Protein backbone atom coordinates (compact mmCIF):
# COMPACT_ATOMS: atom_id res chain seq x y z
CA UNK A 1 0.00 0.00 0.00
CA UNK A 2 1.04 3.61 -0.33
CA UNK A 3 3.18 4.95 2.55
CA UNK A 4 0.52 7.53 3.45
CA UNK A 5 -2.14 4.82 3.72
CA UNK A 6 0.23 2.62 5.69
CA UNK A 7 0.94 5.38 8.20
CA UNK A 8 -2.77 6.11 8.55
CA UNK A 9 -3.62 2.46 9.08
CA UNK A 10 -0.81 2.00 11.60
CA UNK A 11 -2.10 5.00 13.55
CA UNK A 12 -5.68 3.73 13.42
CA UNK A 13 -4.63 0.28 14.64
CA UNK A 14 -2.51 1.77 17.43
CA UNK A 15 -5.48 3.87 18.55
CA UNK A 16 -7.78 0.84 18.38
CA UNK A 17 -5.35 -1.19 20.49
CA UNK A 18 -5.23 1.58 23.10
CA UNK A 19 -9.03 1.65 23.27
CA UNK A 20 -9.23 -2.11 23.78
CA UNK A 21 -6.34 -2.15 26.26
CA UNK A 22 -7.99 0.58 28.31
CA UNK A 23 -11.25 -1.36 28.36
CA UNK A 24 -9.43 -4.48 29.59
CA UNK A 25 -6.82 -3.03 31.94
CA UNK A 26 -8.01 0.46 32.84
CA UNK A 27 -5.19 2.69 34.06
CA UNK A 28 -2.69 -0.17 33.67
CA UNK A 29 -3.18 0.02 29.90
CA UNK A 30 -0.56 2.78 29.78
CA UNK A 31 2.12 0.10 30.22
CA UNK A 32 1.08 -1.65 27.00
CA UNK A 33 3.35 -0.64 24.10
CA UNK A 34 2.18 -2.26 20.86
CA UNK A 35 4.46 -2.62 17.85
CA UNK A 36 2.24 -2.31 14.80
CA UNK A 37 3.73 -4.26 11.88
CA UNK A 38 1.84 -4.48 8.62
CA UNK A 39 2.76 -7.10 6.05
CA UNK A 40 1.34 -8.34 2.80
CA UNK A 41 -0.09 -11.86 3.27
CA UNK A 42 1.70 -14.57 1.32
CA UNK A 43 -1.67 -15.81 0.03
CA UNK A 44 -3.70 -13.18 -1.83
CA UNK A 45 -6.97 -14.73 -0.64
CA UNK A 46 -6.06 -13.71 2.91
CA UNK A 47 -6.42 -10.02 2.11
CA UNK A 48 -4.18 -7.08 1.37
CA UNK A 49 -2.64 -6.44 4.79
CA UNK A 50 -1.93 -8.66 7.81
CA UNK A 51 -1.13 -7.63 11.38
CA UNK A 52 -0.12 -9.81 14.35
CA UNK A 53 -0.58 -7.22 17.12
CA UNK A 54 -3.27 -9.30 18.86
CA UNK A 55 -0.84 -12.19 19.35
CA UNK A 56 1.77 -9.77 20.69
CA UNK A 57 -0.53 -8.33 23.33
CA UNK A 58 -2.75 -11.26 24.31
CA UNK A 59 -0.55 -12.31 27.24
CA UNK A 60 0.12 -8.80 28.64
CA UNK A 61 -3.60 -8.06 28.45
CA UNK A 62 -4.57 -11.45 29.89
CA UNK A 63 -6.88 -12.52 27.10
CA UNK A 64 -7.22 -14.93 24.18
CA UNK A 65 -5.50 -13.64 21.00
CA UNK A 66 -8.47 -14.36 18.72
CA UNK A 67 -10.86 -12.60 21.08
CA UNK A 68 -8.45 -9.69 21.34
CA UNK A 69 -8.19 -9.53 17.55
CA UNK A 70 -11.99 -9.38 17.27
CA UNK A 71 -12.10 -6.49 19.74
CA UNK A 72 -9.34 -4.61 17.90
CA UNK A 73 -11.13 -5.09 14.57
CA UNK A 74 -14.40 -3.83 16.06
CA UNK A 75 -12.65 -0.72 17.37
CA UNK A 76 -10.85 -0.19 14.08
CA UNK A 77 -13.89 -0.46 11.80
CA UNK A 78 -15.82 1.93 14.06
CA UNK A 79 -13.30 4.71 13.43
CA UNK A 80 -14.34 7.20 10.72
CA UNK A 81 -10.81 7.26 9.29
CA UNK A 82 -10.91 3.54 8.57
CA UNK A 83 -14.16 3.51 6.67
CA UNK A 84 -12.73 4.89 3.44
CA UNK A 85 -9.57 2.84 3.76
CA UNK A 86 -10.62 -0.62 4.95
CA UNK A 87 -13.28 -2.56 3.09
CA UNK A 88 -13.30 -5.70 5.22
CA UNK A 89 -11.51 -7.33 8.15
CA UNK A 90 -11.31 -10.92 9.32
CA UNK A 91 -9.49 -12.98 11.92
CA UNK A 92 -7.33 -15.87 10.78
CA UNK A 93 -5.49 -18.65 12.57
CA UNK A 94 -4.46 -17.96 16.17
CA UNK A 95 -5.21 -14.23 15.90
CA UNK A 96 -3.93 -12.66 12.70
CA UNK A 97 -5.88 -9.60 11.62
CA UNK A 98 -6.33 -9.66 7.84
CA UNK A 99 -7.57 -6.48 6.20
CA UNK A 100 -8.86 -5.79 2.72
CA UNK A 101 -8.31 -2.28 1.45
CA UNK A 102 -11.10 -0.39 -0.25
CA UNK A 103 -11.10 -0.11 -4.02
CA UNK A 104 -10.45 3.62 -3.74
CA UNK A 105 -7.41 3.02 -1.53
CA UNK A 106 -5.95 0.61 -4.06
CA UNK A 107 -6.66 2.91 -6.98
CA UNK A 108 -5.05 5.91 -5.26
CA UNK A 109 -1.61 4.72 -6.35
CA UNK A 110 -2.40 5.62 -9.96
CA UNK A 111 -3.10 9.24 -9.06
CA UNK A 112 0.03 9.31 -6.89
CA UNK A 113 2.20 8.09 -9.76
CA UNK A 114 0.69 10.60 -12.19
CA UNK A 115 1.18 13.39 -9.67
CA UNK A 116 4.78 12.56 -8.71
CA UNK A 117 6.11 11.12 -11.96
CA UNK A 118 9.82 10.39 -11.76
CA UNK A 119 9.81 11.35 -8.08
CA UNK A 120 7.33 8.59 -7.20
CA UNK A 121 8.91 6.29 -4.63
CA UNK A 122 11.44 8.83 -3.38
CA UNK A 123 11.45 10.41 0.07
CA UNK A 124 13.08 13.36 1.80
CA UNK A 125 13.11 11.68 5.22
CA UNK A 126 16.93 11.75 5.34
CA UNK A 127 17.33 15.19 3.78
CA UNK A 128 20.30 17.07 5.19
CA UNK A 129 22.30 13.90 5.92
CA UNK A 130 25.27 12.70 3.92
CA UNK A 131 26.80 9.31 3.18
CA UNK A 132 30.19 8.41 1.76
CA UNK A 133 30.02 5.28 -0.36
CA UNK A 134 33.37 3.77 -1.34
CA UNK A 135 33.40 1.10 -4.02
CA UNK A 136 35.47 -0.49 -6.78
CA UNK A 137 38.76 0.90 -5.31
CA UNK A 138 40.85 -1.27 -7.62
CA UNK A 139 44.63 -1.31 -7.81
CA UNK A 140 45.70 0.60 -10.95
CA UNK A 141 47.55 -2.48 -12.19
CA UNK A 142 45.18 -3.68 -14.92
CA UNK A 143 41.73 -3.34 -16.49
CA UNK A 144 38.74 -3.76 -14.20
CA UNK A 145 37.72 -7.42 -13.88
CA UNK A 146 34.22 -8.85 -13.44
CA UNK A 147 34.55 -8.76 -9.64
CA UNK A 148 35.11 -5.02 -9.89
CA UNK A 149 32.09 -4.96 -12.19
CA UNK A 150 29.90 -6.55 -9.53
CA UNK A 151 31.22 -4.05 -7.02
CA UNK A 152 30.57 -1.15 -9.41
CA UNK A 153 26.99 -2.31 -9.97
CA UNK A 154 26.36 -2.82 -6.26
CA UNK A 155 27.89 0.51 -5.33
CA UNK A 156 26.27 2.63 -8.01
CA UNK A 157 22.81 1.15 -7.49
CA UNK A 158 23.10 1.36 -3.71
CA UNK A 159 24.12 5.01 -4.07
CA UNK A 160 20.98 5.63 -6.14
CA UNK A 161 18.82 3.76 -3.62
CA UNK A 162 20.23 5.72 -0.68
CA UNK A 163 19.88 9.00 -2.57
CA UNK A 164 16.20 8.17 -3.14
CA UNK A 165 15.68 8.59 0.61
CA UNK A 166 17.04 12.13 0.66
CA UNK A 167 20.69 11.47 1.53
CA UNK A 168 23.44 13.41 -0.19
CA UNK A 169 25.65 10.56 -1.47
CA UNK A 170 29.37 11.03 -2.07
CA UNK A 171 30.77 8.33 -4.37
CA UNK A 172 34.47 7.68 -3.79
CA UNK A 173 37.12 5.48 -5.44
CA UNK A 174 40.24 4.74 -3.36
CA UNK A 175 43.23 4.07 -5.58
CA UNK A 176 45.78 1.68 -4.08
CA UNK A 177 48.62 3.33 -5.98
CA UNK A 178 51.32 2.53 -3.42
CA UNK A 179 52.84 -0.82 -2.53
CA UNK A 180 54.29 -4.02 -3.93
CA UNK A 181 51.78 -4.44 -6.78
CA UNK A 182 52.62 -1.03 -8.21
CA UNK A 183 56.27 -2.06 -8.17
CA UNK A 184 55.36 -5.22 -10.06
CA UNK A 185 53.49 -3.13 -12.63
CA UNK A 186 56.58 -0.98 -13.17
CA UNK A 187 58.96 -3.91 -13.68
CA UNK A 188 56.42 -5.63 -15.97
CA UNK A 189 56.23 -2.54 -18.19
CA UNK A 190 60.00 -2.13 -18.10
CA UNK A 191 60.49 -5.74 -19.22
CA UNK A 192 58.06 -5.26 -22.12
CA UNK A 193 59.82 -2.02 -23.06
CA UNK A 194 63.07 -4.01 -23.25
CA UNK A 195 61.48 -6.40 -25.71
CA UNK A 196 60.78 -9.27 -23.33
CA UNK A 197 57.52 -11.18 -23.16
CA UNK A 198 56.04 -13.76 -20.78
CA UNK A 199 58.04 -16.99 -20.89
CA UNK A 200 61.27 -15.34 -22.03
CA UNK A 201 64.45 -15.69 -20.01
CA UNK A 202 64.65 -12.69 -17.72
CA UNK A 203 60.88 -12.16 -17.56
CA UNK A 204 60.15 -11.12 -13.92
CA UNK A 205 58.46 -13.84 -11.88
CA UNK A 206 55.93 -11.42 -10.34
CA UNK A 207 55.19 -9.62 -13.62
CA UNK A 208 51.74 -9.10 -15.14
CA UNK A 209 51.28 -11.11 -18.34
CA UNK A 210 48.33 -9.41 -20.05
CA UNK A 211 48.73 -7.84 -23.48
CA UNK A 212 47.81 -4.48 -21.98
CA UNK A 213 51.34 -4.31 -20.51
CA UNK A 214 52.74 -4.39 -24.04
CA UNK A 215 50.40 -1.53 -24.97
CA UNK A 216 51.65 0.54 -22.03
CA UNK A 217 55.28 -0.13 -22.93
CA UNK A 218 54.70 0.77 -26.58
CA UNK A 219 53.07 4.10 -25.71
CA UNK A 220 55.79 4.86 -23.14
CA UNK A 221 58.49 4.27 -25.75
CA UNK A 222 56.60 6.34 -28.34
CA UNK A 223 56.35 9.34 -26.03
CA UNK A 224 52.56 9.27 -25.83
CA UNK A 225 50.74 11.44 -23.27
CA UNK A 226 48.10 9.93 -20.97
CA UNK A 227 45.88 11.41 -18.27
CA UNK A 228 43.36 10.10 -15.77
CA UNK A 229 40.08 11.98 -15.41
CA UNK A 230 41.22 13.79 -12.26
CA UNK A 231 44.98 14.06 -12.83
CA UNK A 232 47.73 15.84 -14.69
CA UNK A 233 48.87 14.50 -18.09
CA UNK A 234 51.95 12.24 -18.00
CA UNK A 235 54.23 11.88 -21.03
CA UNK A 236 56.23 8.74 -21.75
CA UNK A 237 59.94 9.52 -21.69
CA UNK A 238 61.05 6.40 -23.56
CA UNK A 239 63.86 5.84 -21.02
CA UNK A 240 63.70 2.14 -20.14
CA UNK A 241 66.13 2.61 -17.26
CA UNK A 242 63.96 5.21 -15.47
CA UNK A 243 61.76 2.89 -13.41
CA UNK A 244 60.08 5.78 -11.58
CA UNK A 245 59.03 7.38 -14.88
CA UNK A 246 57.75 4.01 -16.09
CA UNK A 247 55.78 3.51 -12.88
CA UNK A 248 54.21 6.96 -13.09
CA UNK A 249 53.27 6.50 -16.75
CA UNK A 250 51.90 2.97 -16.24
CA UNK A 251 49.75 3.96 -13.26
CA UNK A 252 48.29 6.93 -15.12
CA UNK A 253 47.74 4.83 -18.26
CA UNK A 254 45.79 2.22 -16.30
CA UNK A 255 43.84 4.81 -14.37
CA UNK A 256 42.76 6.18 -17.74
CA UNK A 257 41.80 2.66 -18.86
CA UNK A 258 39.77 2.13 -15.69
CA UNK A 259 38.09 5.50 -16.27
CA UNK A 260 37.01 4.21 -19.69
CA UNK A 261 35.79 0.95 -18.16
CA UNK A 262 33.67 2.90 -15.68
CA UNK A 263 32.39 5.23 -18.39
CA UNK A 264 31.27 2.24 -20.46
CA UNK A 265 29.55 0.90 -17.34
CA UNK A 266 27.80 4.20 -16.62
CA UNK A 267 29.48 4.77 -13.25
CA UNK A 268 30.73 8.17 -12.10
CA UNK A 269 32.62 9.08 -8.94
CA UNK A 270 32.68 12.35 -7.03
CA UNK A 271 36.24 11.83 -5.87
CA UNK A 272 39.27 9.64 -6.49
CA UNK A 273 41.43 9.34 -3.38
CA UNK A 274 45.04 8.23 -3.84
CA UNK A 275 46.70 5.98 -1.28
CA UNK A 276 50.02 7.63 -2.16
CA UNK A 277 48.68 10.95 -0.86
CA UNK A 278 48.31 9.43 2.61
CA UNK A 279 52.08 8.96 2.66
CA UNK A 280 53.03 12.22 0.95
CA UNK A 281 50.82 14.20 3.34
CA UNK A 282 52.16 12.34 6.40
CA UNK A 283 48.76 10.91 7.34
CA UNK A 284 50.02 7.35 7.76
CA UNK A 285 52.82 8.41 10.13
CA UNK A 286 50.44 10.67 12.02
CA UNK A 287 47.96 7.82 12.51
CA UNK A 288 50.67 5.42 13.68
CA UNK A 289 52.06 8.01 16.12
CA UNK A 290 48.58 8.61 17.53
CA UNK A 291 48.06 4.88 18.11
CA UNK A 292 51.45 4.63 19.83
CA UNK A 293 50.59 7.57 22.11
CA UNK A 294 47.21 6.00 22.89
CA UNK A 295 48.97 2.87 24.18
CA UNK A 296 47.44 0.71 21.46
CA UNK A 297 50.77 -0.68 20.17
CA UNK A 298 53.79 -2.65 21.33
CA UNK A 299 57.14 -3.77 19.89
CA UNK A 300 57.91 -7.45 19.35
CA UNK A 301 60.47 -9.22 17.13
CA UNK A 302 61.46 -5.89 15.61
CA UNK A 303 57.88 -5.18 14.45
CA UNK A 304 55.21 -2.78 15.70
CA UNK A 305 51.97 -4.50 16.68
CA UNK A 306 48.45 -3.11 17.12
CA UNK A 307 46.40 -4.41 20.06
CA UNK A 308 43.45 -5.35 17.88
CA UNK A 309 42.36 -8.00 20.40
CA UNK A 310 41.32 -5.10 22.65
CA UNK A 311 38.63 -4.37 20.06
CA UNK A 312 37.47 -7.94 19.43
CA UNK A 313 39.94 -9.24 16.83
CA UNK A 314 41.09 -12.85 17.26
CA UNK A 315 44.75 -11.81 17.54
CA UNK A 316 46.93 -8.72 17.50
CA UNK A 317 48.16 -7.55 14.10
CA UNK A 318 51.48 -6.30 12.78
CA UNK A 319 51.36 -2.65 11.74
CA UNK A 320 54.97 -2.02 10.81
CA UNK A 321 57.17 -4.90 9.73
CA UNK A 322 60.76 -5.34 10.83
CA UNK A 323 61.94 -3.88 7.51
CA UNK A 324 60.12 -0.62 8.30
CA UNK A 325 57.29 -1.01 5.77
CA UNK A 326 53.64 -0.89 6.81
CA UNK A 327 51.13 -3.70 6.41
CA UNK A 328 48.26 -2.99 4.07
CA UNK A 329 45.61 -2.18 6.70
CA UNK A 330 47.58 0.72 8.21
CA UNK A 331 46.95 3.18 5.35
CA UNK A 332 43.34 1.95 5.39
CA UNK A 333 43.02 3.20 8.97
CA UNK A 334 44.56 6.54 8.01
CA UNK A 335 42.22 6.77 5.03
CA UNK A 336 39.15 6.21 7.19
CA UNK A 337 40.30 8.91 9.56
CA UNK A 338 40.12 11.30 6.60
CA UNK A 339 36.55 10.19 5.94
CA UNK A 340 35.62 11.02 9.52
CA UNK A 341 37.49 14.33 9.46
CA UNK A 342 35.68 15.29 6.26
CA UNK A 343 32.40 15.06 8.14
CA UNK A 344 31.14 11.70 6.91
CA UNK A 345 29.62 10.13 10.00
CA UNK A 346 27.96 7.46 7.85
CA UNK A 347 30.33 5.53 5.60
CA UNK A 348 29.66 2.37 3.58
CA UNK A 349 32.42 0.32 1.96
CA UNK A 350 31.67 -2.26 -0.72
CA UNK A 351 34.39 -4.88 -0.94
CA UNK A 352 35.00 -8.45 -2.01
CA UNK A 353 34.40 -11.08 0.65
CA UNK A 354 38.12 -11.86 0.62
CA UNK A 355 38.59 -8.56 2.49
CA UNK A 356 36.53 -9.79 5.44
CA UNK A 357 39.61 -10.11 7.63
CA UNK A 358 40.47 -6.43 7.33
CA UNK A 359 37.21 -5.22 8.86
CA UNK A 360 38.14 -5.95 12.48
CA UNK A 361 41.62 -4.48 11.99
CA UNK A 362 40.43 -1.22 10.48
CA UNK A 363 37.71 -0.80 13.09
CA UNK A 364 40.15 -1.64 15.89
CA UNK A 365 42.58 0.97 14.62
CA UNK A 366 39.85 3.59 14.45
CA UNK A 367 38.62 2.79 17.96
CA UNK A 368 42.16 2.89 19.31
CA UNK A 369 42.55 6.52 18.22
CA UNK A 370 39.80 7.65 20.64
CA UNK A 371 38.64 10.49 18.41
CA UNK A 372 34.90 9.88 18.74
CA UNK A 373 34.43 7.42 15.89
CA UNK A 374 31.58 5.05 16.85
CA UNK A 375 32.00 1.29 17.00
CA UNK A 376 30.91 -0.43 13.83
CA UNK A 377 32.29 2.39 11.67
CA UNK A 378 32.35 2.02 8.73
CA UNK A 379 29.55 -0.22 7.46
CA UNK A 380 30.52 -2.92 4.97
CA UNK A 381 28.76 -4.72 2.14
CA UNK A 382 30.79 -7.77 1.12
CA UNK A 383 30.20 -9.52 -2.18
CA UNK A 384 31.25 -12.91 -3.47
CA UNK A 385 32.94 -13.78 -6.74
CA UNK A 386 31.53 -13.87 -10.27
CA UNK A 387 31.99 -16.78 -12.68
CA UNK A 388 31.49 -16.06 -16.38
CA UNK A 389 30.00 -18.79 -18.59
CA UNK A 390 29.74 -18.83 -22.38
CA UNK A 391 28.42 -21.71 -24.49
CA UNK A 392 28.37 -23.87 -21.37
CA UNK A 393 32.04 -23.29 -20.56
CA UNK A 394 33.65 -21.12 -17.92
CA UNK A 395 35.52 -18.16 -19.43
CA UNK A 396 38.71 -17.46 -17.50
CA UNK A 397 40.83 -15.37 -19.84
CA UNK A 398 40.54 -12.52 -22.30
CA UNK A 399 42.80 -10.89 -24.86
CA UNK A 400 42.78 -7.66 -22.86
CA UNK A 401 43.87 -8.94 -19.47
CA UNK A 402 45.29 -12.38 -20.15
CA UNK A 403 44.33 -14.10 -16.92
CA UNK A 404 40.83 -12.76 -16.29
CA UNK A 405 37.66 -11.41 -17.93
CA UNK A 406 37.37 -7.63 -17.88
CA UNK A 407 34.30 -5.48 -17.36
CA UNK A 408 34.54 -4.24 -20.94
CA UNK A 409 34.71 -7.83 -22.22
CA UNK A 410 31.52 -8.60 -20.34
CA UNK A 411 29.73 -5.48 -21.59
CA UNK A 412 30.70 -6.11 -25.21
CA UNK A 413 29.91 -9.84 -25.15
CA UNK A 414 26.57 -9.25 -23.43
CA UNK A 415 25.74 -6.62 -26.03
CA UNK A 416 26.25 -9.12 -28.82
CA UNK A 417 29.88 -8.54 -29.83
CA UNK A 418 31.40 -11.65 -31.33
CA UNK A 419 34.34 -13.39 -29.71
CA UNK A 420 37.49 -11.59 -30.80
CA UNK A 421 35.71 -8.32 -31.56
CA UNK A 422 36.86 -6.96 -28.20
CA UNK A 423 40.30 -6.61 -29.77
CA UNK A 424 38.89 -4.24 -32.39
CA UNK A 425 36.89 -1.57 -30.52
CA UNK A 426 36.05 0.28 -33.74
CA UNK A 427 33.72 -2.63 -34.55
CA UNK A 428 31.70 -2.09 -31.36
CA UNK A 429 28.84 0.39 -31.86
CA UNK A 430 27.01 2.39 -29.19
CA UNK A 431 23.91 0.18 -29.38
CA UNK A 432 26.05 -2.85 -28.50
CA UNK A 433 27.53 -1.01 -25.52
CA UNK A 434 24.08 0.09 -24.29
CA UNK A 435 22.62 -3.43 -24.57
CA UNK A 436 25.66 -4.87 -22.87
CA UNK A 437 25.73 -2.28 -20.11
CA UNK A 438 22.03 -2.82 -19.38
CA UNK A 439 22.46 -6.59 -19.22
CA UNK A 440 25.59 -6.53 -17.08
CA UNK A 441 24.26 -3.96 -14.60
CA UNK A 442 20.94 -5.77 -14.21
CA UNK A 443 22.48 -9.24 -13.96
CA UNK A 444 25.15 -8.24 -11.44
CA UNK A 445 22.57 -6.63 -9.15
CA UNK A 446 20.03 -9.44 -9.48
CA UNK A 447 21.42 -11.56 -6.64
CA UNK A 448 22.20 -10.81 -3.02
CA UNK A 449 25.76 -9.57 -2.65
CA UNK A 450 26.75 -12.41 -0.32
CA UNK A 451 25.93 -15.12 -2.88
CA UNK A 452 28.24 -16.31 -5.64
CA UNK A 453 27.05 -15.34 -9.09
CA UNK A 454 27.27 -17.16 -12.40
CA UNK A 455 27.05 -14.72 -15.30
CA UNK A 456 25.69 -16.56 -18.33
CA UNK A 457 26.56 -14.66 -21.52
CA UNK A 458 24.15 -16.78 -23.55
CA UNK A 459 21.27 -15.92 -21.20
CA UNK A 460 22.14 -12.22 -21.42
CA UNK A 461 21.75 -12.44 -25.21
CA UNK A 462 18.35 -14.16 -25.17
CA UNK A 463 15.35 -12.08 -26.19
CA UNK A 464 12.69 -13.86 -24.19
CA UNK A 465 11.31 -13.99 -20.67
CA UNK A 466 14.19 -16.19 -19.48
CA UNK A 467 16.38 -13.09 -19.65
CA UNK A 468 15.35 -10.90 -16.67
CA UNK A 469 16.52 -7.57 -18.09
CA UNK A 470 14.79 -8.26 -21.42
CA UNK A 471 11.64 -9.30 -19.53
CA UNK A 472 11.50 -6.02 -17.60
CA UNK A 473 12.49 -3.78 -20.52
CA UNK A 474 10.01 -5.53 -22.79
CA UNK A 475 7.21 -4.77 -20.31
CA UNK A 476 8.11 -1.08 -20.54
CA UNK A 477 8.34 -1.14 -24.34
CA UNK A 478 5.06 -3.02 -24.66
CA UNK A 479 3.24 -0.40 -22.58
CA UNK A 480 4.76 2.38 -24.69
CA UNK A 481 3.44 0.63 -27.78
CA UNK A 482 -0.07 0.33 -26.31
CA UNK A 483 -0.13 4.00 -25.30
CA UNK A 484 1.04 5.03 -28.77
CA UNK A 485 -1.73 2.93 -30.29
CA UNK A 486 -4.22 4.53 -27.87
CA UNK A 487 -3.26 7.93 -29.25
CA UNK A 488 -3.30 6.75 -32.85
CA UNK A 489 -6.57 4.84 -32.73
CA UNK A 490 -8.64 6.81 -30.20
CA UNK A 491 -6.84 10.17 -30.05
CA UNK A 492 -6.37 9.75 -26.29
CA UNK A 493 -3.17 11.21 -24.90
CA UNK A 494 -1.49 10.05 -21.68
CA UNK A 495 -2.07 13.54 -20.26
CA UNK A 496 -5.83 12.84 -20.37
CA UNK A 497 -5.62 9.59 -18.40
CA UNK A 498 -5.54 11.05 -14.84
CA UNK A 499 -9.22 11.85 -15.39
CA UNK A 500 -10.14 8.22 -16.08
CA UNK A 501 -12.87 6.50 -14.05
CA UNK A 502 -10.74 4.09 -12.02
CA UNK A 503 -13.78 2.34 -10.56
CA UNK A 504 -13.66 0.33 -13.80
CA UNK A 505 -10.59 -1.51 -12.48
CA UNK A 506 -12.40 -4.38 -10.80
CA UNK A 507 -10.45 -7.49 -11.82
CA UNK A 508 -8.15 -9.44 -9.53
CA UNK A 509 -5.27 -8.84 -11.94
CA UNK A 510 -5.80 -5.07 -11.83
CA UNK A 511 -5.93 -5.12 -8.03
CA UNK A 512 -2.74 -7.15 -7.83
CA UNK A 513 -0.92 -4.81 -10.23
CA UNK A 514 -2.02 -1.73 -8.28
CA UNK A 515 -0.90 -3.36 -5.04
CA UNK A 516 2.53 -4.03 -6.55
CA UNK A 517 2.83 -0.41 -7.75
CA UNK A 518 2.00 0.81 -4.25
CA UNK A 519 4.82 -1.30 -2.78
CA UNK A 520 7.53 0.58 -4.71
CA UNK A 521 8.19 3.36 -2.13
CA UNK A 522 8.45 0.94 0.79
CA UNK A 523 10.68 -1.34 -1.26
CA UNK A 524 13.13 1.52 -1.86
CA UNK A 525 13.12 2.43 1.83
CA UNK A 526 13.79 -1.19 2.79
CA UNK A 527 16.59 -1.49 0.23
CA UNK A 528 18.24 1.65 1.62
CA UNK A 529 17.90 0.61 5.26
CA UNK A 530 19.17 -2.92 4.67
CA UNK A 531 21.86 -1.96 2.11
CA UNK A 532 20.13 -4.37 -0.25
CA UNK A 533 20.20 -2.97 -3.80
CA UNK A 534 19.20 -6.36 -5.24
CA UNK A 535 15.70 -5.69 -3.91
CA UNK A 536 15.12 -3.25 -6.79
CA UNK A 537 15.84 -5.91 -9.42
CA UNK A 538 13.64 -8.42 -7.57
CA UNK A 539 10.81 -5.89 -7.45
CA UNK A 540 11.04 -4.98 -11.14
CA UNK A 541 10.83 -8.62 -12.20
CA UNK A 542 7.75 -9.06 -10.03
CA UNK A 543 6.18 -5.85 -11.36
CA UNK A 544 6.80 -6.94 -14.95
CA UNK A 545 5.15 -10.26 -14.11
CA UNK A 546 2.09 -8.53 -12.64
CA UNK A 547 1.85 -6.35 -15.74
CA UNK A 548 1.99 -9.31 -18.11
CA UNK A 549 -0.70 -11.10 -16.07
CA UNK A 550 -2.98 -8.07 -16.25
CA UNK A 551 -2.33 -7.43 -19.93
CA UNK A 552 -2.99 -11.05 -20.86
CA UNK A 553 -6.23 -11.05 -18.86
CA UNK A 554 -7.78 -7.76 -20.01
CA UNK A 555 -7.92 -6.03 -23.37
CA UNK A 556 -6.94 -2.40 -23.11
CA UNK A 557 -7.69 -1.05 -26.58
CA UNK A 558 -11.46 -1.50 -26.58
CA UNK A 559 -14.08 0.88 -27.97
CA UNK A 560 -15.81 1.38 -24.61
CA UNK A 561 -14.18 4.58 -23.34
CA UNK A 562 -14.54 4.12 -19.57
CA UNK A 563 -12.81 0.73 -19.14
CA UNK A 564 -10.32 1.54 -21.92
CA UNK A 565 -9.07 4.74 -20.31
CA UNK A 566 -9.02 3.22 -16.82
CA UNK A 567 -6.90 0.30 -17.99
CA UNK A 568 -4.67 2.62 -19.99
CA UNK A 569 -4.19 4.79 -16.89
CA UNK A 570 -3.06 1.72 -14.97
CA UNK A 571 -0.62 0.87 -17.76
CA UNK A 572 0.73 4.42 -17.86
CA UNK A 573 1.36 4.33 -14.10
CA UNK A 574 3.06 0.96 -14.47
CA UNK A 575 5.27 2.31 -17.26
CA UNK A 576 6.36 5.20 -15.03
CA UNK A 577 7.29 2.94 -12.12
CA UNK A 578 9.19 0.60 -14.43
CA UNK A 579 11.11 3.60 -15.76
CA UNK A 580 11.79 4.86 -12.24
CA UNK A 581 13.07 1.49 -11.06
CA UNK A 582 15.24 0.95 -14.12
CA UNK A 583 16.73 4.42 -13.60
CA UNK A 584 17.74 3.40 -10.07
CA UNK A 585 19.54 0.41 -11.60
CA UNK A 586 21.16 2.62 -14.23
CA UNK A 587 19.44 0.59 -16.95
CA UNK A 588 17.69 2.10 -19.97
CA UNK A 589 13.92 1.98 -20.41
CA UNK A 590 13.47 1.53 -24.18
CA UNK A 591 10.24 2.59 -25.87
CA UNK A 592 10.80 0.02 -28.64
CA UNK A 593 12.44 -3.40 -28.70
Swiss-Prot record:
Keywords: Aminoacyl-tRNA synthetase, ATP-binding, Cytoplasm, Ligase, Nucleotide-binding, Protein biosynthesis. One of its GO terms (biological process) is arginyl-tRNA aminoacylation. Belongs to the class-I aminoacyl-tRNA synthetase family. This is Arginine--tRNA ligase. A motif ('HIGH' region) lies at residues 138-148. Its EC number is 6.1.1.19. It catalyses: tRNA(Arg) + L-arginine + ATP = L-arginyl-tRNA(Arg) + AMP + diphosphate. Disulfide bonds: none annotated. The keyword Protein biosynthesis applies. GO terms for molecular function: arginine-tRNA ligase activity; ATP binding. Monomer. The keyword Protein biosynthesis applies. InterPro entries: aa-tRNA-synth_I_CS, Arg-tRNA-ligase, Arg-tRNA-synth_N, Arg-tRNA-synth_N_sf, ArgRS_core, DALR_anticod-bd, Rossmann-like_a/b/a_fold, tRNAsynth_Ia_anticodon-bd. SMART domains: Arg_tRNA_synt_N, DALR_1. GO terms for cellular component: cytoplasm. It is found in: Cytoplasm. HAMAP family: Arg_tRNA_synth (MF_00123).
Amino acid sequence: MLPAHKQTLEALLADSVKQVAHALKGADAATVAPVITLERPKVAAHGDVACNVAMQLAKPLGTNPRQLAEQIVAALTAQPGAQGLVEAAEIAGPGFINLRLSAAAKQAVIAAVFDQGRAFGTSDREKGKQVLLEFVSANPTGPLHVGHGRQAALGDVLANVIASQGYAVHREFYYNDAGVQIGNLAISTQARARGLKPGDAGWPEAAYNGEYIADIARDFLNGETVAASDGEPVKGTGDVEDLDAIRKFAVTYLRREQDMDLQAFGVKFDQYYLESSLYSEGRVEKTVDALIKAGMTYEQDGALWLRTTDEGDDKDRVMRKSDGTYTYFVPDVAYHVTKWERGFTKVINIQGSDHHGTIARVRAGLQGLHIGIPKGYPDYVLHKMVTVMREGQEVKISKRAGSYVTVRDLIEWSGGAAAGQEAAPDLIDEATITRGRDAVRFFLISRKADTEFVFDIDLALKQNDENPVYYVQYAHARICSVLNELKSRYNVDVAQLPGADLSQLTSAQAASLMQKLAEYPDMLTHAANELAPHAVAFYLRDLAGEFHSFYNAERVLVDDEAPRNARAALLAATRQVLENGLAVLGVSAPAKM
